[in-house]
Amino acid sequence: MTVLTDKIAVVTGAGSGIGEAIATLLHEEGAKVVLAGRNKEKLQNVANQLSQDSVKVVPTDVTNKEEVDELIKIAQQTFGGLDIVINSAGQMLSSKITDYQVDEWDSMIDVNIKGTLYTVQAALPTMLEQSSGHLINIASISGFEVTKSSTIYSATKAAVHTITQGLEKELAKTGVKVTSISPGMVDTAITAAYNPSDRKKLDPQDIAEAVLYALTQPSHVNVNEITVRPV
């Protein structure tokens, strides 16, 4: 028996990169996985590599609260419960404050901050009612280390980290666990557009393994935060 047998997991941003790696690993470990993201074709490509009776594709824009509410509802209707939610959907745009690209600021705030909050608020009532569940938010080292071109992105990821810290305090003694995972540079299509190829990067699988570590601790242990860097 694998370690997550019959656990029901929702993964946002599951069509590629970190989200795809997380969803695939959780499925390999026995979880029933709901794949969420904007691009239905990419989600279906991921699903086609998994066992069809334990995977569900739900195209979802995390900036739309109604779609996120429906995502969680479909997950419960399809598999009969909800145990794990991974907020992996994210957007990284190189946008300085002095560039005045307000539309880019709004987009990153909507995806990275509001998307995380919408998913949490949709999943929490069920988890609180059953006194169990695990929320994992993918933050970033950029939330702690700001470059001249990452101010807004870094601010949104700092917010994700702070949201997770606050949730951990709010949910203490409820049985619901909360974890923030802050990766360094990860080799994905998003980072390829902004970073030199010779810079050391993590593999998306490295982040998936960190997620699995947090999920497989004893019931009395909550891993509050994990930082993952390339060496």
Curated annotation (Swiss-Prot):
Substrate binds at S140. Pfam families: adh_short. One of its GO terms (molecular function) is oxidoreductase activity. NADP(+) binds at residues 10-34. The keyword Zinc does not apply. The keyword Oxidoreductase applies. Keywords: Oxidoreductase. InterPro entries: NAD(P)-bd_dom_sf, SDR_fam. It is an enzyme of class 1 (oxidoreductase). It comes from the Bacteria. The active site is at Y153. Its EC number is 1.-.-.-. Belongs to the short-chain dehydrogenases/reductases (SDR) family. This is Uncharacterized oxidoreductase SAS2370. It comes from Staphylococcus aureus (strain MSSA476).
